[in-house]
């Protein structure tokens, strides 16, 4: 494929370059034509997509359609209820944040970054630090085979957002920075739409904080500042890793 493409395309303004993992190992051979991924790539399909890119195409069906769970379906399945209860500060008469941290500690859940640091202990340490506290979400996936986050975000973005916001609420983060791999162009659009839908649902009162008494109206949910940032070519370009 790599040898045939330059001959097939035959254009000076098109460069064919071998690249390390682009987060699509389950779709090999995978090609990235501009911002458009081509799964199970053939020379003819890559040439077709490349021609579209050169022609200024804004969208291309370079892979099978993805079934993304949108906000109405997520809300209907109980989505954002945990976030609302945590934002209330109490769960079953107990401090919601402390209860969740104890649950994580008891479960023995560990991070997947290599060190295997216990998640509950990390949340407790961060929660005990002086404010302001910030959260950096690293979605770069620079190692071969690590396409799990992309697959998950494509299909269930609101579950990711709720988990992120639950963690931010428990530890008291004032702002969240989502660092997303630059090659994940379609996933960036999915997250942008999901964030816009979430903010609108909060503004409309569809997601609110339950009150302690049945006769008291729900109060608005206050979201932290959330910024979606494009990656810069490697996971070590993220602010979290840069500070380390």
Regions found by a protein language model. Give the residues of each.
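Feature of Fe-S/electron-transfer and energy-metabolism proteins
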Residues: 1-244
């Amino acid at each position: 494929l790599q040898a045939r493409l330059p001959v097939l395309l035959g254009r000076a303004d098109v460069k064919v370059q071998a690249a390390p993992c682009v987060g699509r190992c389950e779709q090999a051979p995978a090609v990235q034509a501009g911002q458009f991924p081509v799964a199970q790539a053939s020379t003819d399909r890559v040439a077709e997509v490349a021609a579209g890119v050169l022609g200024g195409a804004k969208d291309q069906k370079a892979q099978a359609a993805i079934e993304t769970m949108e906000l109405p379906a997520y809300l209907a399945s109980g989505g954002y209820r945990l976030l609302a209860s945590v934002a209330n500060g109490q769960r079953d008469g107990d401090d919601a944040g402390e209860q969740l941290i104890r649950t994580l500690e008891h479960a023995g859940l560990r991070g997947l970054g290599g060190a295997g640091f216990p998640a509950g202990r990390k949340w407790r340490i961060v929660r005990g630090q002086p404010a302001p506290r910030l959260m950096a979400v690293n979605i770069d996936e620079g190692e071969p085979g690590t396409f799990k986050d992309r697959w998950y975000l494509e299909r269930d973005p609101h579950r990711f957002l709720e988990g992120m916001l639950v963690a931010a609420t428990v530890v008291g983060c004032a702002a969240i920075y989502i660092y997303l791999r630059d090659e994940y162009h379609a996933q960036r659009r999915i997250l942008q739409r999901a964030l816009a839908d979430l903010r609108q649902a909060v503004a409309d009162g569809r997601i609110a904080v339950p009150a302690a008494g049945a006769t008291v109206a729900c109060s608005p949910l206050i979201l932290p500042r959330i910024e979606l940032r494009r990656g810069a070519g490697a996971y070590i370009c993220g602010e979290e890793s840069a500070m380390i």
